[in-house]
């Protein structure tokens, strides 16, 4: 299964690290490029923007959002909603 992961703090990066060895493809993004590079070294596909993340995901897309609750999460879900299409899924973690 292919999954987009937005937010690579402790929880998001550890989720991706658990999914990768189980054979899942993770396409990852974080505003901080460091954890993106770390996960690329572990087999994830890194991206530098939400646009690039959405572009690299196959339809129907599934994107797991692991950013802090509140305005940041609301804005991220809103921004993804503008880029995704009917049939795509956002998981707000």
Residue ranges and their predicted role:
Residues 65-79:
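Beta-loop-alpha module in the N-terminal Rossmann-like domain of NAD(P)-dependent dehydrogenases
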Residues 1-65, 83-93:
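NAD(P)+-binding Rossmann beta1-loop-alpha1 motif at the extreme N-terminus of oxidoreductases
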């Amino acid at each position: 299964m292919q999954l987009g992961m937005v937010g690579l703090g402790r929880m998001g990066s550890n989720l991706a690290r658990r999914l990768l060895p189980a054979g899942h493809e993770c396409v990852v993004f974080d505003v901080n490029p460091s954890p993106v590079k770390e996960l690329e070294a572990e087999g994830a596909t890194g991206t530098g923007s939400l646009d690039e993340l959405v572009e690299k995901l196959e339809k129907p897309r599934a994107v797991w959002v692991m950013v802090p609750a509140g305005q940041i999460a609301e804005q991220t879900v809103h921004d993804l909603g503008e880029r995704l299409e009917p049939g795509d899924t956002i998981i707000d973690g």
